[in-house]
């Protein structure tokens, strides 16, 4: 959301500053290293048609491409790409650094400045004041972020990254209410420990696909497969035994999750009659052994996560890089926004992405395009 917002504003002539906590994490995909999918792939192509960059970046960094829903009509065909997570970041950064009118500043916003009900700027952790006609907040899961692995809690906006503090409270002073939501991410697996012969390979499609309508015909990176397998009743038994230490079920986490992101423990509780759940093992990049286990998002204790996964034949010798975890974060009630995503209480303050209670890279990116802020003449000075 932040990348598309900054690029759109600058390309339309506004003098723009993109403030980010870490320039080396611009456009970081916080969860799975993939773009598109059912309903979402169409959104990426609409972003591209409107002049956005998400499709171009995805095409440049894709390591697998597939079209989902082929059994349905063309309107339902959904492009989906696995991406190299790190190359995705650097492709976005290269684009943003070369857009006229766009400056990048590495810092953390802690306070908004408001006069007579209208935004006038922000103040950062370093004490720098930026005066602005318009401010777009795309803070993701970083506002007062708190991560959970079992009963262990650690402040942060993402694994090994600090949370953002004071900004929520600064906004709330102006009558904008906020709540807490939670989401989660799965373990990252060392590919050298996986028995691929016990999984079903899922190759990309050999016919050429891309997201962008721009004339880019080169497949930049080596194309890699994904793999699929299933949980089993022994896995579910171990997960059930760990539920007393699950933050989702022992009262440690009180907040709710956005739609479409259920944890594995939620699946076994919600669907106790299902003997198995499908998992997808996805490569994180062209040159890394790190793998993402789609379908096994969890905040259970690390030893429970590992013990359960080792009951799957392909993971009997499992080695992980880091456990799955849940994260709680602040969000702002979207009923306080106009249809343009401008806040009703503060003129020219816009929210986009996960801070509105949404989820997904594509949804976050496209929300920016519902806002007139970048193309409003009064904000271009």
Predicted regions: what they are:
Residues 125-134:
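Core beta-strand elements of the Rossmann-like FAD/NAD(P) dinucleotide-binding domain
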Residues 263, 270-283, 287-302:
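C-terminal catalytic lobe of FAD-dependent flavoproteins
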Residues 2:
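N-terminal Rossmann-fold NAD(P) dinucleotide-binding loop
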Residues 369-374:
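Conserved small/polar residues in nucleotide/adenosyl-binding loops
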Residues 157-160, 357-367:
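A conserved FAD-binding loop/helix module that cradles the flavin
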Residues 7-113, 126, 138-158, 162-168, ...:
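Conserved N-terminal/central alpha/beta ligand/cofactor-binding core
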Residues 170-179, 235-251, 297-325:
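Flavin-binding catalytic cores
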Residues 292-358:
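A glycine-rich dinucleotide-binding beta-alpha-beta segment and adjacent secondary-structure elements
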């Amino acid at each position: 959301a932040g990348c598309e917002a900054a690029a759109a504003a600058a390309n339309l002539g506004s003098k723009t500053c993109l403030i980010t906590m870490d320039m080396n994490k611009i456009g970081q995909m916080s969860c799975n290293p993939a773009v598109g999918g059912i309903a979402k792939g169409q959104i990426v192509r609409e972003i591209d048609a409107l002049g956005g960059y998400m499709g171009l970046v995805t095409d440049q960094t894709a390591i697998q491409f597939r079209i989902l829903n082929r059994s349905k009509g063309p309107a339902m065909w959904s492009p989906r790409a696995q991406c190299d997570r790190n190359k995705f970041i650097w492709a976005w950064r290269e684009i943003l650094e070369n857009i006229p009118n766009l400056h990048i500043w590495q810092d953390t916003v802690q306070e908004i400045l408001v006069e007579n009900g209208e935004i006038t700027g922000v103040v950062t952790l370093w004490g720098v004041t930026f005066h602005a006609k318009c401010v777009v907040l795309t803070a993701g899961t970083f506002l007062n972020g708190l991560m959970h692995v079992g009963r262990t809690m650690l402040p942060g906006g993402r694994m090994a990254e600090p949370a953002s503090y004071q900004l929520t409270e600064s906004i709330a002073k102006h009558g904008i209410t906020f709540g807490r939501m939670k989401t989660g991410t799965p373990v990252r697996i060392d590919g050298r420990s996986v028995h691929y012969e016990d999984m079903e390979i899922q190759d990309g499609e050999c016919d050429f696909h891309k997201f962008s309508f721009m004339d880019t015909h080169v497949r930049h990176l080596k194309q890699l497969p994904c793999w699929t397998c299933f949980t089993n009743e022994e896995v579910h038994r171990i997960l059930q035994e760990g539920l007393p230490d699950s933050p989702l079920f022992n009262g440690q986490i009180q907040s709710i999750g956005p739609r479409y992101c259920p944890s594995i423990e939620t699946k076994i509780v919600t669907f106790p009659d299902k003997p198995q759940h499908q998992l997808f093992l996805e490569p994180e990049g062209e040159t890394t052994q790190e793998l993402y286990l789609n379908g096994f998002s969890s905040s259970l204790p690390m030893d429970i996560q590992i013990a359960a996964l080792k009951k799957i034949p392909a993971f009997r010798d499992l080695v992980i890089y880091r456990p799955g975890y849940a994260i709680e974060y602040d969000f702002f009630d979207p009923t306080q926004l106009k249809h343009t995503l401008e806040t009703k209480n503060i003129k020219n303050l816009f929210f986009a992405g996960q801070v509105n209670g949404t989820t997904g890279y594509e949804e976050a990116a496209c929300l920016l395009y519902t806002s007139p802020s970048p193309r409003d003449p009064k904000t271009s000075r």
